[in-house]
């Protein structure tokens, strides 16, 4: 999804020391208490031997109790163990740490910047919690997703895992605002690049020849981790996926404090468009989708709010610079089609506008639905399945009324030309004062 938010450093809770400590934490639960030592113990009822009887009385055999082994807590498949029980000290793994280069190289060793980075560690802990949930859920999903599954099964399986690992089922009022799913799970097939999740009754089935973008987010107290990957079963699409993964990693490498957006976009496009893919005997250049962007991420605002910034994936963008303390989703999209998307298909994604006008609503259904949205999602995006799950029904008229009045935004699926194939990879990065942290980085991508 796209975005804006310029979080000042004063609003950040960044602590590099907490992340380093996380490396030493094993994902185990507390061990059971060990059994007491019993060497040399005798039965109290055993009497002294009678005089002259040297054989009748015998010492009772020692009873050596076996020590109980501690039970290691590990994640289940599918993931259902709350993450805090695997990390009882609440110290979660750090992401990939990248030192700043060139004119910003001094930040890595500058004591003032290091001190600033150690402040407000709650911010970093919440981000790392969300990132570890994302890693564990997606790593299982990449193994479990197979042709023949419905898109609804795939999306809901991911969402149930996120709810379980964060400990926020989201059924009680306000629970989803404390943690859980940050936005609807995108399961975008082939020419559809973004913003598609199945509505109720959807029967679409994943096929072997499909290319599916899986885009989901996790948040803890509004600290959103946004990351996406692409699945293709047929190796014919390998170059398409490689191009987009390379482009995303190039964008991450280029990103940093005082770096211009236009420079990042140019580097991304150059990396991506150096690839081509052959499908059924025809070679297609991989094109960067020029009207899709990365974005800043704000608290409870996936696209950063009214002051958010966009990160282009083609050359020629504006001269805006990245700033210290900002959080970015670096995402790139490649296509075998035109490299341009448009609205298409049935809308499923919605979000309440942060600075929506105070409009008098005439429809009672719209008033009631707005109350449900505010108390359960705030400004986090939601989909129609989430309203169904909360027991809402016959809400479409009210929802459309909220959209028409400029209170809720609708995000239709974004698609290139039919017959084309698109791919996406995405990571969330934190521009900390002294280092750049790719918070969502994992062994998978």
UniProtKB/Swiss-Prot annotation:
It catalyses: Release of N-terminal amino acids, preferentially methionine, from peptides and arylamides. Its cofactor is Co(2+); Zn(2+); Mn(2+); Fe(2+). A divalent metal cation 1 binds at residues 215, 226, 426. GO terms for biological process: proteolysis. It is found in: Cytoplasm. It holds the Pfam family Peptidase_M24. InterPro entries: Creatinase/aminopeptidase-like, Met_Aminopeptidase_Type2, Pept_M24, Pept_M24_MAP, Pept_M24A_MAP2, Pept_M24A_MAP2_BS, WH-like_DNA-bd_sf, WH_DNA-bd_sf. Residues 1-80 are annotated as: Disordered. It is an enzyme of class 3 (hydrolase). It comes from the Eukaryota. Gene3D superfamilies: Creatinase/methionine aminopeptidase superfamily (3.90.230.10), Winged helix-like DNA-binding domain superfamily/Winged helix DNA-binding domain (1.10.10.10). Substrate binds at residues 195, 303. Binds 2 divalent metal cations per subunit. Has a high-affinity and a low affinity metal-binding site. The true nature of the physiological cofactor is under debate. The enzyme is active with cobalt, zinc, manganese or divalent iron ions. Most likely, methionine aminopeptidases function as mononuclear Fe(2+)-metalloproteases under physiological conditions, and the catalytically relevant metal-binding site has been assigned to the histidine-containing high-affinity site. Keywords: Aminopeptidase, Cytoplasm, Hydrolase, Metal-binding, Protease. HAMAP family: MetAP_2_euk. Cotranslationally removes the N-terminal methionine from nascent proteins. The N-terminal methionine is often cleaved when the second residue in the primary sequence is small and uncharged (Met-Ala-, Cys, Gly, Pro, Ser, Thr, or Val). Belongs to the peptidase M24A family. Methionine aminopeptidase eukaryotic type 2 subfamily. This is Methionine aminopeptidase 2.
């Amino acid at each position: 999804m796209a975005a804006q938010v310029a979080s000042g450093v004063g609003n950040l809770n960044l602590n590099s020391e907490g992340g380093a400590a996380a490396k030493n934490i094993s994902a185990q639960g507390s061990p059971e208490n060990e059994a007491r030592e019993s060497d040399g113990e005798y039965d109290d009822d055993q009497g002294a031997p009678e005089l002259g009887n040297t054989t009748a009385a015998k010492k009772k055999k020692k009873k050596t109790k076996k020590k109980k082994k501690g039970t290691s807590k590990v994640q289940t498949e599918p993931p259902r163990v709350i993450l805090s029980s695997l990390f009882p000290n609440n110290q979660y793994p750090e992401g990939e740490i990248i030192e700043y280069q060139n004119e910003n190289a001094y930040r890595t060793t500058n004591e003032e910047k290091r001190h600033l980075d150690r402040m407000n560690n709650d911010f970093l802990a919440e981000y790392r919690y969300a990132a570890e949930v994302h890693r564990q859920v997606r790593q299982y999903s990449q193994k479990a997703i197979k042709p023949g599954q419905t898109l609804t099964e795939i999306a809901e399986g991911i969402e149930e895992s996120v709810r379980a690992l964060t400990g926020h089922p989201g059924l009680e009022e306000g629970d989803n605002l404390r943690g859980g799913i940050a936005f609807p799970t995108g399961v975008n097939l082939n020419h559809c690049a973004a913003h598609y999740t199945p509505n109720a009754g959807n029967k679409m089935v994943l096929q072997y020849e499909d290319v599916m973008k899986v885009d989901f987010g996790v948040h803890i107290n509004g600290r959103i981790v946004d990351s996406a990957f692409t699945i293709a079963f047929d190796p014919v699409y390998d170059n398409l996926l490689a191009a987009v993964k390379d482009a995303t990693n190039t964008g991450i490498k280029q990103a940093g404090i005082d770096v211009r957006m236009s420079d990042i976009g140019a580097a991304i496009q150059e990396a991506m468009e150096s690839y081509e893919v052959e499908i059924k005997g025809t070679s297609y250049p991989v094109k960067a989708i020029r009207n899709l962007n990365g974005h800043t991420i704000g608290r409870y605002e996936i696209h950063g709010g009214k002051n958010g910034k966009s990160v282009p994936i083609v050359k020629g963008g504006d001269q805006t610079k990245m700033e210290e303390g900002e959080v970015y989703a670096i995402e790139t999209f490649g296509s075998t089609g035109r490299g341009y998307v448009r609205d298409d298909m049935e809308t499923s994604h919605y979000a309440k506008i942060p600075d929506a006008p105070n409009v008098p609503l005439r429809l009672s259904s719209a008033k009631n639905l707005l109350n449900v949205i505010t108390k359960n999602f705030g400004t986090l995006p939601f989909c129609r399945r989430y309203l169904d799950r909360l027991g809402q029904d016959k809400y479409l008229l009210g929802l459309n009324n909220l959209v028409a009045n400029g209170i809720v935004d609708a995000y239709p699926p974004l698609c290139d030309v039919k017959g084309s194939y698109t791919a996406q990879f995405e990571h969330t990065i934190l521009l900390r004062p002294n280092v750049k942290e790719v918070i969502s980085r994992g062994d998978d991508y």
